[in-house]
């Protein structure tokens, strides 16, 4: 059951209305009994008034005994199903489920077009139409924020920063030396645009190198909680359109991340490395500095990238090697350990 303290249930929704709403994403059988659907639940918990979904085949065993009135399933699903459950077949069942969530629920919390009294907004700052600025937020000189944007409580937007339309900057975010596009989401605690880790050692002293670059973030980007993105040292740090960056990711100075790439939690990318378009870095991946990862390449979780990776390659391990080599290494290592233990 969705907690009503945080989300409003917009139901009940008729099953036929759900099928109509999802018609661009699903194939639905003829619905003879237009039952009222009250909620979305997992297969194990769904009742005869609920709808469910299946995107991971590991859970298909629950379809046999589920009580759900309907279930969104992959288009080619052929497993055993409760005969009372209507199947809505989707090319991408997880995507269809996401659309269904939007049809059923809305956040309780709203953001009126308002600047809270405890917020500080510099006179030279430009705030667009229908924006919300939360308690104790700070917006410094010459900041520009586009229409329909949200700046939540305690966030700091430094001098000269530009943020596009329909941005959502959650609580306690710090943004400096940055130009940010439209439809960007930055989750709580993220730090954008601070100095990178640049020092020169001379006569036993570590001398800080002043960073003159900025951070450029494209359109429709999401940046996770407590992620840190350093501004460029001389060349800018660039996050292109459609990127998704998870929580607790570190992106070093002058890194470039190509369009549509995904970086999972606790990954770290050292300075001046370039990640191509639509790449995927798994959790805890480390990328050394000044490397190039080609378009569409993937690095398995905890991979350590110490050399360039060609476009489309899949690698794993530390140091990272082609994924099949990594699997072979793992098997051989296990065999050696078992042999020594006998």
Curated annotation (Swiss-Prot):
Keywords: Acyltransferase, Lipid A biosynthesis, Lipid biosynthesis, Lipid metabolism, Repeat, Transferase
Domain of life per record: Bacteria
Gene3D superfamilies documented for this protein: Hexapeptide repeat proteins, MurE/MurF, N-terminal domain
Catalytic activity: a UDP-3-O-[(3R)-3-hydroxyacyl]-alpha-D-glucosamine + a (3R)-hydroxyacyl-[ACP] = a UDP-2-N,3-O-bis[(3R)-3-hydroxyacyl]-alpha-D-glucosamine + holo-[ACP] + H(+)
GO molecular function: N-acyltransferase activity
Enzyme active site: 253 (proton acceptor)
Assembly: Homotrimer.
Family: Belongs to the transferase hexapeptide repeat family. LpxD subfamily.
The name this protein goes by in its record: UDP-3-O-acylglucosamine N-acyltransferase
Organism: Rickettsia bellii (strain RML369-C)
Source species taxonomy: Bacteria, Pseudomonadati, Pseudomonadota, Alphaproteobacteria, Rickettsiales
Gene for this chain: lpxD
